[in-house]
Swiss-Prot record:
Gene Ontology process terms (BP): symbiont-mediated evasion of host restriction-modification system; symbiont-mediated suppression of host innate immune response
Record key words, sorted: Decarboxylase, Host-virus interaction, Inhibition of host innate immune response by virus, Lyase, Restriction-modification system evasion by virus, Viral immunoevasion
Lineage of source species: Viruses, Duplodnaviria, Heunggongvirae, Uroviricota, Caudoviricetes
Keyword Lyase: yes
Function, as annotated: Converts 5-Calpha-glycinylthymidine (Calpha-GlyT) into 5-aminoethyl-2'-deoxyuridine (5-NedU) as a step in the pathway leading to thymidine hypermodifications in the viral genome. As a final result of the pathway of hypermodification, 5-aminoethyl-2'-deoxyuridine (5-NedU) substitutes for about 30% of thymidines in the viral DNA. These modifications probably prevent degradation of viral genome by the host restriction-modification antiviral defense system.
One Pfam family recorded for the sequence: PALP
GO molecular function terms listed in the Swiss-Prot or TrEMBL record: carboxy-lyase activity
Superkingdom in the source lineage: Viruses
Family, similarity comment: Belongs to the pyridoxal-phosphate-dependent aminodecarboxylase family.
Name the record gives this protein: Glycyl-dTMP PLP-dependent decarboxylase
Source species of the chain: Pseudomonas phage M6
Length: 278
């Protein structure tokens, strides 16, 4: 269901070798290729309920991940997804919901709105329509996502340089918290500078606080946030990568790294790019 020890491969940017952690390979098809699924597997395995619900967002693969895990474990998935006005009456207009349906999930659309309201609506619908059910935490902020990604970072540590710069794209920061926790457990974090590239603009202080609390770490001044002002629905433009890369997250970070001016600022040691997934 999950692939551990995903490879570290070397790619070049402007003649500079970049070590890329290929977490896009962590879940084979028909699963979604993003490393947050590590925590989804562990979390659902520990739930006794037979029906597992999940709230999706505009470009989230959360419902797809939950549907994949539920199919593997013999549970029923329910994917709640936001219907925008531009969707009209289209049935499952986005590919991630189509994949969830193919894996056996029930699809329930909710008029798009604020995430907290959508989550409350989904929870109420699930409770009223599905016996023995459970709704996954919003944004899949799972403690298991931290512990499982930390474990993968520890497994990867022997294949990485003893020092350098780590570049990670972040949304909520859950996966990054796990990776940083793993680097700390492996004795690497003290020797690494860390660049957290924000997939969309929001409070850096709140994001740092969440990551530090989730990882049980004090990050200090070696952690640098890069906020290029992206909106949540913005995809990277005029950018490509030589490996599968999510246009809403990792590809933005790769595009930033591809800029020679940005790359020059971190050329004081090896560079590790943690590709969370496609």
């Amino acid at each position: 269901m999950i692939v551990n020890n995903t490879p570290v491969e070397t790619y070049e940017l402007n003649g500079v070798p970049i070590l890329v952690k290929r977490e896009d390979l962590c879940a084979p098809l028909p699963g979604p290729s993003f490393s947050k699924i590590r925590g989804v597997v562990a979390h659902i395995k520990n739930r006794p309920e037979t029906t597992i619900g999940c709230l999706d967002t505009y470009h989230s693969k959360a419902g797809w991940a939950v549907a994949y895990v539920c199919q593997q474990l013999g549970k029923q998935a329910v994917d709640y997804w936001p219907r925008f006005k531009r969707d009209g009456a289209a049935d499952a207009p986005r590919v991630q919901q189509q994949h969830a349906r193919q894996l056996g999930a029930d699809l329930v659309d909710i008029p798009a709105g604020r995430s907290a309201i959508l989550y409350h609506t989904a929870k109420k619908h699930l409770r009223e329509n599905y016996h023995d059910s459970y709704l996954m935490p919003n944004a899949l902020k799972l403690p298991e996502s931290i512990t499982e990604n930390a474990a993968e970072a520890v497994r990867t540590a022997p294949h990485l340089p003893d020092s350098g710069t780590l570049v990670i794209s972040i949304s909520s920061g859950t996966v990054a918290a796990g990776v940083l926790k793993g680097f700390e457990e492996a004795g690497l974090l003290r020797n690494y500078n860390v660049i957290l590239h924000m997939g969309y603009s929001r409070s850096q202080d709140a994001t740092r606080e969440y990551i530090e609390k989730a990882a049980g770490l004090t990050l200090g001044d070696r952690i640098k946030f890069i906020d290029e002002g992206y909106g949540y629905a913005d995809a990277a433009r005029d950018a490509s990568a030589p490996f599968p890369c999510n246009p809403f997250y990792d590809l933005k970070a790769w595009k930033w790294l591809s800029n020679p001016t940005n790359l020059e600022t971190i050329l004081d040691g090896p560079i590790v790019f943690w590709n969370i997934g496609e």
